[in-house]
Amino acid sequence: MIKIAITKGRIQKQVTKLLENADYDVEPILNLGRELQIKTKDDLQIIFGKPNDVITFLEHGIVDIGFVGKDTLDENDFDDYYELLYLKIGQCIFALASYPDFSNKNFQRHKRIASKYPRVTKKYFAQKQEDIEIIKLEGSVELGPVVGLADAIVDIVETGNTLSANGLEVIEKISDISTRMIVNKSSFKFKKDKIIEMVERLEDAQTN
């Protein structure tokens, strides 16, 4: 049996479609009620959770495989996993965004950067050898520059429509984001053949 955790919401819907295209039994997922975990005819046991919970399940060996966004992986310090598959799901970017004149400003203090992703933000500016003040926001991060709380933001950008609607723009792309299929290293050691078979089936389903 392979135990899997899938991020709830859009990723769940898109991964379900991918599993279906790979000829896996998705009937229990499509008919999901209040069950906390389900089993399929393919000997898969699946649970659904919030992004950080998927990481926690994997970290503690509760599941073998996780489907989770690269943004969540980058923001966590868990690294005891292998990244098996780059899925064409939830594609977007991490970006530094601000007003158009941001790059030309001479700051007499540390730049204030608003973000839901302090770890990603800290790493990005550390690579640029810049000391900054990180302001953690949980809601609309774009409000940071708009209300004068921050000079710029680090956030996920998909279409850029929200940025442009508020007079902001992408200053620099940080990295590409998409859903990733990851496996606990210990699980891969003991269930390698079954896991590789699953990866190959999903790869074929992505390209067909």
From Swiss-Prot:
Note, other: The stability and homogeneity of the HisG-HisZ complex is apparently increased by ATP and 5-phosphoribose 1-diphosphate but decreased in the presence of the regulatory inhibitor histidine.
Catalytic activity: 1-(5-phospho-beta-D-ribosyl)-ATP + diphosphate = 5-phospho-alpha-D-ribose 1-diphosphate + ATP
Organism of derivation: Lactococcus lactis subsp. lactis (strain IL1403) (Streptococcus lactis)
Annotated protein name in UniProt: ATP phosphoribosyltransferase
Keywords per UniProt: Amino-acid biosynthesis, ATP-binding, Cytoplasm, Glycosyltransferase, Histidine biosynthesis, Nucleotide-binding, Transferase
Coarse class of the protein's main subcellular location: cytoplasm
EC number: 2.4.2.17
Keyword presence, Glycoprotein: no
HAMAP family: HisG_Short
One of the protein's GO biological processes: L-histidine biosynthetic process
Keyword Cytoplasm: yes
Role description: Catalyzes the condensation of ATP and 5-phosphoribose 1-diphosphate to form N'-(5'-phosphoribosyl)-ATP (PR-ATP). Has a crucial role in the pathway because the rate of histidine biosynthesis seems to be controlled primarily by regulation of HisG enzymatic activity.
Notes on the domains: Lacks the C-terminal regulatory region which is replaced by HisZ.
GO MF, one annotated term: ATP phosphoribosyltransferase activity
NCBIfam families membership: hisG
Location in or out of the cell: Cytoplasm
Pfam families named among the record's database cross-references: HisG
Known partners and oligomeric status: Heterooctamer composed of four HisG and four HisZ subunits.
Family: Belongs to the ATP phosphoribosyltransferase family. Short subfamily.
InterPro entries: ATP_PRibTrfase_cat, ATP_PRibTrfase_CS, ATP_PRibTrfase_HisG, ATP_PRibTrfase_HisG_short
Chain segments annotated as transmembrane: none
Enzyme class per UniProt: transferase
GO cellular component annotations of the record: cytoplasm
Pathway info: Amino-acid biosynthesis; L-histidine biosynthesis; L-histidine from 5-phospho-alpha-D-ribose 1-diphosphate: step 1/9
